[in-house]
Amino acid sequence: MGSCSCTRRHFLLSICFLQVITIIERQVFDFLGYMWAPILVNFFHILFIIFGFYGAYHFRVKYIITYLIWNFLWIGWNTFLICFYLNVGQLNRDSDLLNLGTGSVSWFEANGYGCKPTYNMAADDTFRPQRPERVEGCLLDYPLVEITHSGVQCALALLGILGAILISCIFLDEDDRFDFMNGDAKSPQHTVVHPMYVSYTSIPTTSASATMQSNKHLQLQHQQPQQNSLKLYHHQQQQQPKLHHFNKNYQLSGSNNNTLNNNLHQRAPALLPPNTTNNRSASFQTQSHPSNNHVTQRTGGEGSNCSSLRRHRQHHSKALVSPSPMSPQTTPSLSYASLQNSSPYLAGNSLSNSNYSIFQSPDSLQGSSHFARIHHKPKPPKSDYPVSGEFNPGGNISSPVRPLDRLSRSLEDDEDNFSLQKFAPGEHGVTYVPFQSPTPNSLFLGENNNSQPHLVFHTNSRSSPNNNAYPYDQSGLPSSLRMGSNSNARRPTHIPLPTVPMHNCQEVENDEDADGESEQDHDQMLTPPPPPLVRPHIHQRLGQAPYLDLSPEVAERYAIPSKLGPSLPIQVPLPVPHGSPMVRRSNRRPRPSNPVNFCDQIRATPPGYVVRAQSDDRLMEQVEADAAPHVNRRSGRGGSGQKTRPRSFCNSIVGVQG
């Protein structure tokens, strides 16, 4: 049916095209014969043909129906013309009915093919067009030509009516298939303007990175229950044959990010050491046998991507490690780590500084433990401090870092809002530091936590390839945390601020084989920085000045006498002194106190200089203009015959009135 509709549409478009061609041809000959009534009707016919063409092309039924109705009227008009030229009834083709009283007739009457008209020169009415008395030798008489034109128009109108009816039937009889607003779906030429509804929403305030981070955080929260169930089943299968050995040596394995697994704590709370608190905010290790140095390897379940290898060393296992107890009166600290640990939802965001970015694991959201994952960005070492620590066989451990400069060294090494002790980065540059919520009370001293044990860090004297100069295990984990036995000692609360080294202007030789004494001598010799080099002015370097020379010798050449005083004779210009303009400016004498009119000068640009606005050429033109006849009617002359200078603010300065 779609192909049929396209065929009907093409048929109607073809009929409209033929009608336009024939009516234009008829309109031209009607203009030549001054037939005004057919001319007006032909204009209307051309207009309705355009309506029909547009309706058939765009499937507009209203335009097609309008074209259909006009075709009936057009057939009636052409029928009248046929009857008029055939003299049917009382109609007479020699009357003035079609020419509207102008007396004109069809152009084909005297200009037909082979026609030879004969005119009567003795015409009575000179205002009417002259008609021939008789015409001989015409191939076709003009009435026959006009009847042929009208018959062709009637035939085309009938075909147009047929095509319009066929297309209108598609619109009127098949409304269930054809959508009036959308038109025929199978016609690619159909173009309809449809209303468009636009909904305005506010601009999102969150960035793309924050949105991606929040989506990842929610996804990890949804996956956490399933991972916990898998890890619980896996640990139950592995810990069943090793339950009798659990009191001697155990180590808790984490998930994919090597964090603390809380499921094993919930299954065996009685097996934990008595000095372990309930918050479980650190990875801990019991005192094992000195000869027990086996390797424990576990996986965190099916979701684990790699195995975590942990090797226990003898010097690490000779002392108990326990996290600092959590006090409800812990002094809050305005540090970056406490801000991250106090708000679990804030820790998931992309808050970071230049060297570290802290991320809290989703595993810590369900329990009370908090872990900060520090993404370390390695940078060149700034300073190394000689740290020495000794182990007592009795279990007492001396702090490897002096209490006064424990935090000051971290402030000196890391110029950030958040800085901790030097930890070794683990795998993929990630270091895990155990924290307590809301703040790690072992790192911040106050009045209410002086009597509590504090965390100290173990070090080694051997060199390390990392920036922190601390050893780390093969698995990438930092050294275990130690607590000294003398935990009741009061720690100082006044920590000195870091000092900034002075600027050393002495050139240091980059000799790698130089001894230590020479390096210390170079470091102790501190001198102030050298003064900046004196650079000549830009005009002195270029050898020229951007402003004109206004030395007294040159200024006298441009001095214009006041109009109130007598006119001075023109002086011979003095020779220009030799040298650059800068040399002449530096050697000039003080200006004489002669009253000079500064109306021709600009005193404001730039400060300290006076720039002349008129040159020698303009002064010569002014002299010639004064000598020439007065032709400028806008500027008058004074009574003395001199040209009056226009008033300006310069007149009030020098005391001259215009």
From Swiss-Prot:
<feature type="glycosylation site" description="N-linked (GlcNAc...) asparagine">
    <location>
        <position position="305"/>
    </location>
</feature>
<comment type="function">
    <text>Induces a small but significant sodium conductance when expressed in Xenopus oocytes.</text>
</comment>
<feature type="transmembrane region" description="Helical">
    <location>
        <begin position="64"/>
        <end position="84"/>
    </location>
</feature>
<dbReference type="GO" id="GO:0002028">
    <property type="term" value="P:regulation of sodium ion transport"/>
</dbReference>
<feature type="transmembrane region" description="Helical">
    <location>
        <begin position="152"/>
        <end position="172"/>
    </location>
</feature>
<feature type="glycosylation site" description="N-linked (GlcNAc...) asparagine">
    <location>
        <position position="355"/>
    </location>
</feature>
<dbReference type="GO" id="GO:0005886">
    <property type="term" value="C:plasma membrane"/>
</dbReference>
<keyword id="KW-0325">Glycoprotein</keyword>
<feature type="compositionally biased region" description="Basic residues">
    <location>
        <begin position="309"/>
        <end position="318"/>
    </location>
</feature>
<feature type="region of interest" description="Disordered">
    <location>
        <begin position="248"/>
        <end position="337"/>
    </location>
</feature>
<dbReference type="InterPro" id="IPR008516">
    <property type="entry name" value="Na/K-Atpase_Interacting"/>
</dbReference>
<feature type="modified residue" description="Phosphoserine">
    <location>
        <position position="308"/>
    </location>
</feature>
<keyword id="KW-1003">Cell membrane</keyword>
<feature type="modified residue" description="Phosphoserine">
    <location>
        <position position="399"/>
    </location>
</feature>
<dbReference type="Pfam" id="PF05640">
    <property type="entry name" value="NKAIN"/>
</dbReference>
<protein>
    <recommendedName>
        <fullName>Sodium/potassium-transporting ATPase subunit beta-1-interacting protein</fullName>
    </recommendedName>
</protein>
<feature type="glycosylation site" description="N-linked (GlcNAc...) asparagine">
    <location>
        <position position="275"/>
    </location>
</feature>
<feature type="glycosylation site" description="N-linked (GlcNAc...) asparagine">
    <location>
        <position position="279"/>
    </location>
</feature>
<feature type="modified residue" description="Phosphoserine">
    <location>
        <position position="291"/>
    </location>
</feature>
<feature type="region of interest" description="Disordered">
    <location>
        <begin position="571"/>
        <end position="601"/>
    </location>
</feature>
<comment type="subunit">
    <text>Interacts with nrv1.</text>
</comment>
<keyword id="KW-1133">Transmembrane helix</keyword>
<keyword id="KW-0597">Phosphoprotein</keyword>
<feature type="glycosylation site" description="N-linked (GlcNAc...) asparagine">
    <location>
        <position position="449"/>
    </location>
</feature>
<feature type="transmembrane region" description="Helical">
    <location>
        <begin position="1"/>
        <end position="22"/>
    </location>
</feature>
<keyword id="KW-0472">Membrane</keyword>
<feature type="region of interest" description="Disordered">
    <location>
        <begin position="222"/>
        <end position="241"/>
    </location>
</feature>
<feature type="transmembrane region" description="Helical">
    <location>
        <begin position="31"/>
        <end position="51"/>
    </location>
</feature>
<feature type="modified residue" description="Phosphoserine">
    <location>
        <position position="398"/>
    </location>
</feature>
<feature type="compositionally biased region" description="Low complexity">
    <location>
        <begin position="322"/>
        <end position="335"/>
    </location>
</feature>
<feature type="compositionally biased region" description="Polar residues">
    <location>
        <begin position="274"/>
        <end position="308"/>
    </location>
</feature>
<feature type="region of interest" description="Disordered">
    <location>
        <begin position="621"/>
        <end position="658"/>
    </location>
</feature>
<keyword id="KW-0812">Transmembrane</keyword>
<comment type="similarity">
    <text>Belongs to the NKAIN family.</text>
</comment>
<feature type="glycosylation site" description="N-linked (GlcNAc...) asparagine">
    <location>
        <position position="396"/>
    </location>
</feature>
<feature type="glycosylation site" description="N-linked (GlcNAc...) asparagine">
    <location>
        <position position="257"/>
    </location>
</feature>
<feature type="glycosylation site" description="N-linked (GlcNAc...) asparagine">
    <location>
        <position position="417"/>
    </location>
</feature>
